[in-house]
A protein has these predicted regions:
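Amphipathic alpha-helical dimerization/coiled-coil segments
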Residues: 12-44
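Hydrophobic packing residues in well-ordered alpha-helices of helical domains and bundles
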Residues: 5, 31-35, 54, 58, ...
């Protein structure tokens, strides 16, 4: 189940990011600002060791990426996938037992590639970031 959820998230989020990267500059910058805001919150909560708040900001960051595609059907599908992810991820792996340093660093790198409008690197890093969840689950089992 974890693998299927992560694979589906990867498909949706990378597609959405590719669509967002094709936007005209003004629209692109507005969407980028939203993603930056959540990335900054993740970093702030990481420094404050607020794992619940960080996890919520992380979910919002990924949702903002999907919303960047301007596709309501995709958003609706993603809400269901994100719900399944919450169940398999947060019930199986307690928040307080996690190391979020890699998550925050990944967000920083993804954001840099988005800012540079390097679609390939941004999508590849996002894909690796989500797929890292599968590896972390395997380590915990």
């Amino acid at each position: 189940m974890v693998k299927q959820v992560c694979e589906t998230r990867t498909l949706i989020e990378t597609y959405a990011l590719e669509k967002m990267m094709q936007e005209e500059e003004e629209v692109f910058q507005q969407k980028l600002d939203v993603i930056k805001r959540y990335s900054d919150k993740c970093e702030e909560y990481y420094r404050q060791e607020k794992s619940v708040e960080l996890a919520l900001a992380d979910l919002e960051l990924h949702k903002a990426i999907v919303e960047g595609a301007n596709n309501e059907i995709l958003n609706d599908v993603y809400v269901g996938i994100q719900g399944r992810f919450i169940v398999v991820n947060y019930l199986i792996r307690p928040l307080k037992n996690r190391n979020y340093e890699g998550t925050v660093q990944d967000h920083f790198e993804i954001l840099k590639f988005i800012e540079d409008r390097d679609t390939k690197k941004a999508v590849d890093k996002l894909r690796n970031h989500i797929q890292g969840t599968i590896k972390r689950f395997c380590e915990d089992e």
